[in-house]
Amino acid sequence: MKVVSFKICPFVQRVTALLEAKNIDYELEFISLSDKPQWFLDISPNGQVPVLITDGDKALFESDAIVEYLEEAFPPLQADTSPEDRATNRAWSYLASKNYLVQCSAQRSPDQDVLDERSAKLGKAFDRMEKQLGDTSFFGGEDVGMVDIAWLPLLHRADVVEKHAGYDFVGDRPKLKAWQRQLMDTGLAEKSVAPDFEDAFANFYLSDQTFLGRGGKVENRCFAGACVTDACC
């Protein structure tokens, strides 16, 4: 099984984190989004990552579809869940994935005012999850589930930003903060990205081109010749 990837794409990390959580063997192939190879364009109708190439040599695209396939084709992370619970989990997972690009935009903010505005949008999703979380280690209990996997890219990036730039997207949300720490402690965040993920992430989001990096005016440029928002799904 192979995942075609771009190093700092949160949609890719959702897929690779699920593969790691299920202990499924896979390989990663990174491509340049500024010079997409023809073989990739042939199997990705939207020209976006991730693409999962199954052991049966079938190319699957769109991260939502890929994670549904992995949950159906391999033993589920949480067995014996009801149809209602699975639907609820999909809804909370969707709240995460629809905010991946919101967080990406906030991380690229050129100044404090823009950062505040964009962070407020992400904060609304965080507020909703803060109210939903209980006293268990993870979203649905004491084991990692599909909702945890969906939220991991958001909380991982928030952790990296806080560590490198001192800005805390999670803020004063104690349950969300505890959940973030539990997820980081699983090791799934590090296992589901490239070894040089933090360097690549910092070069794009925490450079002198962004307020979180050094502040000041930012030019509208793209990482490695391709905007993240145009290339991830």
Residues covered by each model-derived region:
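Surface-exposed helix-capping loop/turn segments at secondary-structure junctions
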Residues: 131-142, 187-193
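GST-like domain detector, emphasizing the conserved glutathione-binding G-site
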Residues: 1-139, 208-233
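Short alpha-helical "patches" and their helix-cap loops
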Residues: 82-83, 112-120, 164-179
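Non-catalytic, well-ordered alpha-helical scaffold segments
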Residues: 64, 87-90, 148, 152, ...
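Amphipathic C-terminal alpha-helical segment
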Residues: 105-108, 157-164, 189
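GST superfamily/GST-like fold recognition
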Residues: 141-164, 175, 183
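Alpha-helical scaffold segments in carbohydrate-active enzymes
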Residues: 14, 91, 95, 128, ...
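A contiguous, mid-protein "functional segment" used to position or interact
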Residues: 166-204
